[in-house]
Amino acid sequence: MLNRVILMGRITQELELKTTASGISVTSFSIAVDRNYVKQGEQRQTDFINIVCWRQQAEFVCRYFGKGSMIAIEGQLQSRTYQAKDGTNRYEIGRAHV
């Protein structure tokens, strides 16, 4: 089976590099990805995709990108097993390559 996702969009927030208790770098953010099609008489719709980067990828993203930057992400879609505080299901791109 194949689980490969490629996304291109703009980073929607300021990036923050965090470190876990075991010393691993991590950052999480969302990107705004416009849909390819627009129904006649309607505005283009945008999807907001949550991304998590670990280790050197996290450090690279925080060093060279910022809010509003266009970024391409390749990885695997992984569904999370919890709900956010607002009750929505969360999804993220795991094992991402920037």
Model-assigned labels for residue ranges:
Residues M1-H97:
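Single-stranded nucleic acid-binding surfaces, predominantly the OB-fold ssDNA-binding core
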